[in-house]
Amino acid sequence: MPEDTSYSNSFEDYYNNSHAISPYKDSFYKEMTPSKPNVRFGDDDVNIFDQRKKVNEINKNNTVKRSIPSSISTTITPNKSSLKSPRGKRASKNSFDNETKLESKNETLKEVNDAVNRCYALCNIPTKHVSINSISDLAQTFETLAVGITHETNRKAECERSKNAIDSLYYHEQLEKKELNEKSLQMAIDHLLKVTKQNLRQADDGNKLKETEALKSFIEEIEEVDDNKISINSLQQQLLEEKTANNILRRDYYKLQERGRRLCHEFQELQDDYSKQMKQKEYEVQKLKNEIKVLLNMNDNLKAEKAHYSQKEKQYFQKYTYIEKYMNHVKEEYNRKEDECKKLNFIIDKSMKKIEHLERSLQTQFTAQNSFSTAMIQEEGPKDAHLKDRYHKVKEFMEQKLQTSKINDPSCSEAEALDNVLCLIESSMKTLDKNSKCYPIATKKCIKYVTDSPRLKENEHVTN
């Protein structure tokens, strides 16, 4: 993958200046970084702190411990003047340089890890929760990530240089060891032990003490060779762990880069959608403004019409009040006239009934009088031979008048009808008595015969 060097100048300024502020220590990313974020790339669940476990162990185990072989007696104290040999100076200088480089690497690795963790956390934001502010923050984060990637690339180059230096040191140490003959080394060690024992027994001999000091210096040189070998092994182990950490970081970097491409694509789509939505919103806002103007004009017109109609309403209300009062007065007059009309109608109906009753009575009386006068029995002699026949004629006349009376006046009872018929007969008889006084006996006999009939006996009050 090609290396992005667009932000290499910022890293070089930070790396060359020991008092510069790290571009990765941004308070914004500390606030955005959760306590333990989990990032999903495809089908892999990546836990940041689990992936960085080995890297943190490397940071804790960076110092190289120098130990004294157990074969050498601790009672022998080396002379400080013997450590000033050229070989000892070179070894101590190389060790100091290595420790300085390791400390610098530790700080750089820690800052890169912090930057990667922050990028992991920001990449874990769901797309549906991404807003315009978070997109701009994410763009700024990718800029910082690019700086961190450049920093990581330079750190890898520095690790390669350290590896080459370690390999060179190990090669020179091997050459120095090859110069020593194993047999002579064993003889020297045996001689050293022998002389040491003699020096312990004979401490007053000055020449032996000088020889002992020389042997001590020789032992210290051998110890330095062993310590250098231990340091080389430690550095090799550290280099292997750093390679493992670099592989992890490289894999995470590729995943972050792919995630960044997707987010950039989504960011571009969101920008396009946002632009379209803003244009649509502006169009809708302008449309609403125009509608508001039209509505305001309509509102003004409605207010003017409302004032005009209010004035008309007052006028109509005054007219309505006057009309209502007049209608109430007319209604009262109408009710009064209606009551008077009802009274008059009642009187008229009553009078009409009386008139009709009188007319019917008069007509009946007149008809009965005429009929009875024609049906009256004339006396043929001293004997009443035809009295029974005349009685039947009178009886038929009375029944006919009774039926006529019931038809003309249905409300009239049978007793009243009989009373009316008898009154007619009586009046007719009186008229006959006045006009023809020569027939009083025959008339009395006829009336007596009629009143003795069974029909009249049923109505005793009429007979009485």
Swiss-Prot record:
The keyword Cell cycle applies. Residues 71-102 are annotated as: Disordered. Keywords: Cell cycle, Cell division, Coiled coil, Cytoplasm, Cytoskeleton, Meiosis, Membrane, Sporulation. Its main location: membrane. GO terms for molecular function: structural molecule activity. It is found in: Prospore membrane; Cytoplasm, Cytoskeleton, Microtubule organizing center, Spindle pole body; Cytoplasm, Cytoskeleton, Spindle pole. One of its GO terms (cellular component) is cytoplasm. Residues 99-119, 156-193, 231-365 form a coiled coil. One of its GO terms (biological process) is vesicle docking. Interacts directly with SPO21/MPC70, NUD1, SPO74 and SPC42. Probable component of a spindle pole body (SPB) complex composed of ADY3, SSP1, DON1, MPC54, SPO21/MPC70, NUD1 and CNM67. Involved in the pathway that organizes the shaping and sizing of the prospore membrane (PSM) during sporulation. This is Meiotic plaque component protein 54. It comes from Saccharomyces cerevisiae (strain ATCC 204508 / S288c). The gene is MPC54.
